[in-house]
Amino acid sequence: MKYKISVVVCVKNEEARLEECLKRVQMNEPDEIIVVDGDSSDRTAEIAYKYTDHVITTHKSNLTRDRQIGLNAARNEYIAMIDGDHRLEKGDLELLLKDLLDNKFVIVQSQLKSFSNMNWMNRGEEQMWDLFHNIPGPKQMIGVAPAMYRKSIFERILFDDRITKTIDDTDFIYRLSRLPDVRYGIGNTKIAQLHTDAYRDYIKKFKWYGIGDGEFCIKHRNRAPSMWFHLLIRYPLLYPVRAILKRKIYAAGYCFLQGLIRARWMVVTSMKKAA
């Protein structure tokens, strides 16, 4: 590998998925692997130590703070942020770095695909990615993993867990967008994501997203109307119509359900924290 890459993996209670994740990270031969364990109560840390000596255990922390802790600990300019449910193929890190350099981005997120489609929810999620996410180029909003970063950008901006402790993507990228002369977006590399087929896990994930959306609205009140439109109109109405027109029927149901659940928890969180 021409450039040295650090990999940061932030996890909590991920014993079921972490080993395969780290095997595939190791297969890509990064210069270092850093695992930030959010004080797991299972075998997460034990599994992490099989693949790296650089395991950081945090206490009374959150995902937003843990991401910055991992980034701060990295010794290289190029850092890949990988989560426990991501499944790399050999060469993915080099390809993701190529996307970063070719586009002169400070952050590039990969395209996404489902590691295994076991039911309509898995298929709907993958169809949604193909419709709305897997479009390479500069973007206004991206996710923070799986992604490649230039460490130097963190001289100008940091992950901030003040209020936004649950979901970090929206707050961080929104603040990044306000910096002059920065480019970020989606690359050509496609990385697999392993989600279970359990309906309750998807409901839990949508609730988690909605709580994060509510925190974002409290922190950035000027963006609240846009977020409300996103979850009350775009997700449950506009996205399903577009999905049906593109014959992505599973995506229509997936977006509708996600929009309703996220909107509910966004409202609950906004009202609770505003009280």
For the regions a language model picked out, list residue spans one by one.
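A conserved acidic beta->alpha catalytic loop
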Residues: R24, D37-A45, H86
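Conserved donor NDP-sugar-binding/catalytic core segment of glycosyltransferases
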Residues: R87, G91-M121
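Non-catalytic, C-terminal membrane-associated alpha-helical segments of glycosyltransferases
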Residues: K205-G212, I218, N222-A275
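Acidic donor-binding loop at a coil-to-helix junction in glycosyltransferase catalytic cores
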Residues: K165-Y174
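A recurrent flexible, glycine/aromatic-enriched loop bordering the glycosyltransferase active site
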Residues: S114-N117, D130-Y149, T164-K165
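Short aromatic/hydrophobic "clamp" motif used to bind/position activated sugar donors
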Residues: I79
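Glycine-rich, basic loop-to-helix element that forms the pyrophosphate-binding segment
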Residues: T58-A74, L95
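Short, well-formed alpha-helical segments that are part of the catalytic scaffolds
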Residues: N13-M27
